[in-house]
Amino acid sequence: MNQEAFSTADAQGYFSRMLRGETPPAPVLTLLGSRIDAVDAAAGSLSARYEAQANFRNPAGTVQGGMLSAMLDDLTASLVDATLAAGQAVATLSLNVSFLRPAQVGTLQGEARMLRRGRDVCHVSGTLLQNGKEVATAVAVCKIVSVPS
């Protein structure tokens, strides 16, 4: 798929196609080293891994908070995406991030949990862990939108 021509119509079913390996991940997911480990849409949970690269470091030598925020945005929106019907897509309305400790270059484990799923608005929590310790948490409010066919 030509990424420059990616449209909202392409979003329909994108998550499912990506999990099945039928379409490559979006460039931002490649940048973040995103890999979905497990999804349980019925239980409202998702596990993923991210690879923080050396070029994600801030002047202090730890992973820059904006990169962690991008990981949490992907994590929470992916859980909502896993629950969508045909003709729907997800858009993040807000993302409230708390940074708990510095993250180092390397693997981060992500865990997302659906707090509330309404007809068109979802509240989702996300946590990033490194070496079993919480690095950052977030609560996202996501909007379910109709995708023009």
Predicted regions and their residues:
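Terminal targeting signals and extreme-terminal segments of soluble enzymes
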Residues: 1-149
